[in-house]
Amino acid sequence: MTLRINDIAPNFTASSTQGEINFHDWIGDGWAVLFSHPKYKTPVCSTELGEVEKLADEFAKRNVKTIGLSVDTVDETSSWLEDISDIAGAKPSFPIIADTDMAVSKLYNMLPTLEEGTSDGRTALDNETVRTVFIVGPDKKIKLYLTYPMTTGRNFNEILRVIDSMLLTSSHPVATPVNWKKGEEVIIKPSVKDEEAKKLFPDGWKTIKPYLRKIPDPSK
């Protein structure tokens, strides 16, 4: 199944390092980041999981839950946690899905649906496409997905930046420009005509082009 932005994130029930999880129930009324890993005890993924734990407070204050996924058993994944603590100085407190039968990886289009067997005997290279980040909104829709090569670690400060943009643009009729960071100027959406913009933004705006109007961050 091909997944696109604004599709409903497929629901599933799966085992994890914190027991059985129903994904939609687990998300609740907040946001979620699901990020996947091809195999336990792989070097790049170990640094990523540790970094997400270090950023736990940043995700929490944005009402965002994080959940990992690895194509392994619960025991294998659980045995990885101490290694992550040694490597990154932080042991993951968030759940990691043990996708033993690869069902979630297939459901989320990270592995071919016709792929047979279980995680047993598979290597990280067999699962190299299981390197995707999904951001899911309170409406359970996919807001973003990014797939990374095995040799490139993910930038979770960038994930937080994207979440800040989504939180702002979901509550104000604006968009965020290139390299935007929280607190910087934003762009009035082109669909908002000048007459409506005058009511929404009575302090006015800076016109770069008729289709590019900038205002201060309206959340400040």
PLM region spans:
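Chalcogenol-based redox active-site neighborhoods
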Residues: 1-220
